[in-house]
Swiss-Prot record:
<dbReference type="InterPro" id="IPR013785">
    <property type="entry name" value="Aldolase_TIM"/>
</dbReference>
<dbReference type="GO" id="GO:0046872">
    <property type="term" value="F:metal ion binding"/>
</dbReference>
<feature type="binding site">
    <location>
        <position position="229"/>
    </location>
    <ligand>
        <name>Zn(2+)</name>
    </ligand>
</feature>
<dbReference type="InterPro" id="IPR008567">
    <property type="entry name" value="BKACE"/>
</dbReference>
<feature type="binding site">
    <location>
        <position position="47"/>
    </location>
    <ligand>
        <name>Zn(2+)</name>
    </ligand>
</feature>
<keyword id="KW-0862">Zinc</keyword>
<dbReference type="GO" id="GO:0043720">
    <property type="term" value="F:3-keto-5-aminohexanoate cleavage activity"/>
</dbReference>
<keyword id="KW-0012">Acyltransferase</keyword>
<protein>
    <recommendedName>
        <fullName>3-oxoadipate:acetyl-CoA acetyltransferase</fullName>
        <ecNumber>2.3.1.318</ecNumber>
    </recommendedName>
</protein>
<keyword id="KW-0808">Transferase</keyword>
<comment type="similarity">
    <text>Belongs to the BKACE family.</text>
</comment>
<dbReference type="Pfam" id="PF05853">
    <property type="entry name" value="BKACE"/>
</dbReference>
<keyword id="KW-0479">Metal-binding</keyword>
<feature type="binding site">
    <location>
        <position position="49"/>
    </location>
    <ligand>
        <name>Zn(2+)</name>
    </ligand>
</feature>
<comment type="function">
    <text>Catalyzes the condensation of 3-oxoadipate (beta-ketoadipate) and acetyl-CoA, forming acetoacetate and succinyl-CoA. Is likely involved is the degradation of 3-oxoadipate through an alternative pathway, within catechol degradation.</text>
</comment>
Length: 284
């Protein structure tokens, strides 16, 4: 059977504002509604940042708690993944929401240049975030911005800092970081298969490269990420009307490439996560 494709939706991010696209969900209710619609369109994993009311990035655990509660109610079974990225807090503040026990959390295993700053991930912070994820039984999604981050993730797994099979997200298209290049992506995938044969991976392209990365990921056996965090446009002329519209676009690509869109149960099994119910009870 052809492997199903997990569609991840990054609904908000830290950067897009309403002025960029009015559909960017900012409030708790907007984020819950946007996730529900994306879920109904085929997304089985939601990547979460939260915002303050003035649209600035936040790492406030209470806000994460309210979003997670709403998503678990209105998109039952969807894989919840919180961001520990550096725009919404400093140091250990970035992991303040991990005690809420989402299914997954992002973990960058090294530092990288971004358009106007360094995305700083010093080893002691990376180790602390990984330890918190392990303590709360949260599966990390390794954010790989270059090749070294794959090797670092494997080393952390071998040292017992990360449990279970790795899940890597290859991020391409951020200015000053790795550009979108199919040969590089293919080498990343080859390297990952050599170092961690049981690992899974997702491709994430930024802006106009979002669909290009989705196509390559489908061809190479990976999974796909979409959403207004990475790209506010449906095409060159059209703003995306919703996260659900972007998910539908990727779902159509899955059909084109003969990759069925993963169900919640399939996505959880592929990532080694608990099923929707444990002993007849919700895992939450």
């Amino acid at each position: 059977m052809t492997q199903p494709c997990i569609i991840s939706v990054a609904i908000t991010g830290s950067l897009p504002r309403k002025r960029d696209n009015p559909a960017v969900p900012i409030t708790v209710s907007e984020q819950v509604e946007s996730t529900q619609a994306a879920f109904e369109a085929g997304a089985t994993l939601v990547h979460l940042h939260v915002r303050n009311d003035d649209e600035t990035p936040s790492s406030e655990p209470d806000r994460f708690a309210r979003v997670l509660e709403g998503i678990r109610k209105h998109a039952p079974g969807i894989i919840t993944q919180v961001s520990t990225g550096g725009r919404s807090g400093a140091g250990r503040e970035r992991g303040g929401m991990l005690s809420l026990r989402p299914d997954m959390a992002s973990l960058a295993t090294g530092s990288v240049n971004f358009p106007t700053r360094v995305y700083d991930n010093p080893p002691d912070l990376v180790d602390w975030l990984a330890a918190e994820m392990k303590a709360y039984a949260i599966k990390p999604e390794i954010e790989a911005f270059d090749l070294s981050m794959i090797f670092q993730a494997v080393a952390m797994q071998q040292a017992g800092k990360i449990d279970g099979a790795l899940h890597i997200q290859f991020v391409m298209g951020i200015k000053n970081a790795m550009p979108v290049d199919r040969e590089v992506l293919a080498f990343y995938v080859h390297t990952l298969r050599r170092l961690a044969p049981d690992a899974t991976w997702t491709g994430a392209g930024i802006g106009r490269d979002q669909l290009t990365m989705a196509r390559w990921s489908l061809e190479l056996g990976g999974h796909c990420r979409t959403g207004l965090e990475d790209n506010v446009r449906l095409d060159k002329q059209t703003l995306a009307p919703s996260n659900a519209a972007l998910v539908s676009q990727v779902a159509a690509l899955c059909e084109e490439y003969g990759r069925p869109v993963a169900t919640v149960a399939q996505a959880r099994a592929l990532l080694g996560l608990p099923s929707m119910e444990i002993d007849g009870r919700s895992p939450w």
